[in-house]
């Protein structure tokens, strides 16, 4: 006789996750559930939902690193439970951050003696780094104005209209007027002469970008420095420069070592760089470096001792993980100058492959420059039939995430697509992307043209009345719908026609 018994609902170990009750209901969206669920079910359900995310390696919109060596992944996981602010408890982690600051400062040609410690701090990204640099400029300007008995209520900062949104955040959050140099067609970075013309006695600094988000172009920091030196001599001001090198800070020293953009220029007082971009670390690490101690006002530095020892701190947040700092140190010593140079050269070569492939199609204008961040920004030569947004949308069907966007003022009428070439974007992928873009263009060519539809839907019939006068008769909504249906039926029928074996 076979004995059997019913399995209780609590005996979940015998159930497949997909045979359990946990996949029969929707996941909580607003309130925490009353009851627990097995760890296997929680993992499987969340993992399944995450499958709908894009593939990070094919996310060509992002500058952020999406691949690191397995050895570094191990270091990250082994330190993921360390809180960086516990400096007394994790002194080696603090030492690694200080080493990173020193290495990056020397990379940017900071005027340091051989054993002198650099002034800088690790952040969660360039946005926080820019906030800190901006606060230092504002406080220095305020202190100088107060000493001169002048008002301090109207600080401003001069940037190009192509700056990343974090500059707008800084201006709004910390009550600084943002004075933007407008762009123009064919010139998508800040014009140094226009920027200097905007400078007045209330300008806390001029921000230059080494690697525009829009097209990767390096702004002419040296020309800006030279023009600003002359203006400072004429006016008696001492307006400084901050370089936003979020993208280009780990590129220029290796690909363009002779380019003067950093602390070699006397008015450059601080530089930020994203470790999680071309510093080759996963998201969550940035750096800001000051020229010397005098450029970071002491009153902005806090000293705390409730974690076991006196700790100076200058950050906008408090707790943060240590793993990204450790990963940055790994990359700096693992790759060295040789390794970073090889990576950046590979990125540039793959950028050239992609750019030349797009040029051969004769369908696109290349908006990006040869010298700059390794990316390709391009726009349609003829957008009367189809748009860059349609190309971006259709590329997702092949797995590619390629952003389309309009330029800032006064070039809003220009729309571009942008492909960022990262370390893990190989030549094979570049060639494959060109093939898929050509496929998309052929598919779009087969679609009813936007212009043709506009003409057909807005078409008007002309008829003669009894007095031989021409009377215009507009199509009804039903007629327009019939035209659309007829057009799509023809399109579908043509798509079904084949010649040979499918």
From Swiss-Prot:
Domain of life: Eukaryota
Activity regulation comment: Up-regulated by calmodulin binding at physiological pH.
Gene3D superfamilies: 3.90.1150.160, 4.10.280.50, Type I PLP-dependent aspartate aminotransferase-like (Major domain)
Region feature Calmodulin-binding, mapped onto this chain: 469-502
Keyword Cell membrane set for record: no
UniProt tissue specificity: Expressed in roots. Detected at low levels in shoots of young seedlings. Not detected in the root tips or in the central vascular bundle in the elongating region of mature roots.
Record site feature (Anchoring site for calmodulin binding), residues: 496-497
Top enzyme class: lyase
Keywords: Calmodulin-binding, Decarboxylase, Lyase, Phosphoprotein, Pyridoxal phosphate
pH dependence: Optimum pH is 6.0.
Reported induction: Down-regulated by salt treatment. Not induced by hypoxia.
Free-text function comment from the UniProt entry: Catalyzes the conversion of glutamate to 4-aminobutanoate (GABA). The calmodulin-binding is calcium-dependent and it is proposed to directly or indirectly form a calcium regulated control of GABA biosynthesis.
Record's comment describing the protein's domains: The N-terminus (1-57) is involved in the formation of the multimer. The C-terminus (471-502) binds calmodulin in a calcium-dependent fashion and contains probably an autoinhibitory domain.
Known partners and oligomeric status: Homohexamer. Interacts with calmodulin with a 1:3 stoichiometry.
Protein known as: Glutamate decarboxylase 1
Organism: Arabidopsis thaliana
């Amino acid at each position: 006789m076979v004995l059997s018994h019913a399995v209780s609902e609590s005996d979940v170990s015998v159930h497949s996750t997909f045979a359990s009750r946990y996949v029969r209901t929707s996941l909580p969206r607003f309130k925490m559930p009353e009851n627990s669920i097995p760890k296997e079910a929680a993992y499987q359900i969340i993992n399944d939902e995450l499958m709908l995310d894009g593939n990070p390696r094919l996310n060509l919109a992002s500058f952020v690193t999406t691949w690191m060596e397995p050895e570094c992944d191990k270091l990250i996981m082994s330190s993921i439970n360390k809180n960086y602010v516990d400096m007394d408890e994790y002194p080696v982690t603090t030492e690694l951050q200080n080493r990173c600051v020193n290495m990056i400062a020397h990379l940017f040609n900071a005027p340091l003696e051989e054993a002198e410690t650099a002034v800088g701090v690790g952040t969660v990204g360039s946005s926080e780094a820019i906030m800190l640099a901006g606060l230092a400029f504002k406080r220095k300007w305020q202190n100088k104005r107060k000493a001169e008995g002048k008002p301090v209520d109207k600080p401003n900062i001069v940037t190009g209209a192509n700056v990343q949104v974090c500059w707008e955040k800084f201006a709004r959050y910390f009550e600084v007027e943002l004075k933007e140099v407008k762009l123009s067609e064919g010139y998508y970075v800040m014009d140094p002469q226009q920027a200097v013309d905007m400078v007045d006695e209330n300008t806390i600094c001029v921000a230059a970008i080494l690697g525009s988000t829009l097209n990767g172009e390096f702004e002419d920091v040296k020309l800006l420095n030279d023009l600003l030196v002359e203006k400072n001599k004429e006016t008696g001001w001492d307006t400084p420069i901050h370089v936003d090198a979020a993208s280009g800070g780990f590129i220029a020293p290796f690909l363009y070592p002779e380019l003067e953009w950093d602390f070699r220029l006397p008015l450059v007082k601080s530089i930020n760089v994203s470790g999680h971009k071309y510093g080759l670390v996963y998201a969550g690490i940035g750096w800001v470096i000051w020229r010397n101690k005098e450029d970071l006002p002491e009153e902005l530095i806090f000293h705390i001792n409730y974690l076991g020892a006196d700790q100076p701190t200058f950050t906008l947040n408090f707790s943060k993980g240590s793993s990204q700092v450790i990963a940055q140190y790994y990359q700096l010593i693992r790759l060295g100058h040789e390794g970073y140079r090889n990576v950046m050269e590979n990125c540039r070569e793959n950028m050239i492959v992609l750019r030349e492939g797009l040029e051969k199609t004769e369908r696109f204008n290349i908006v990006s420059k040869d010298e700059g961040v390794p990316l390709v920004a391009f726009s349609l030569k003829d957008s009367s039939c189809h748009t860059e947004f349609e190309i971006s949308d259709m590329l997702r069907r092949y797995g590619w995430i390629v952003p389309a966007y309009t330029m800032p003022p006064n070039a809003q009428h220009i729309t571009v697509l942008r492909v960022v070439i990262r370390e893990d974007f190989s030549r094979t992928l570049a060639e494959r992307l060109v093939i898929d873009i050509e496929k998309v263009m052929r598919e779009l060519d087969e679609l009813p043209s936007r212009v043709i539809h506009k003409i057909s839907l807005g078409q008007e019939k002309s008829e003669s009345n009894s007095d031989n006068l021409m009377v215009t008769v507009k199509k009804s909504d039903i007629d327009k719908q019939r035209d659309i249906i007829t057009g799509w039926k023809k399109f579908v029928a043509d798509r079904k026609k084949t010649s040979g074996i499918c």
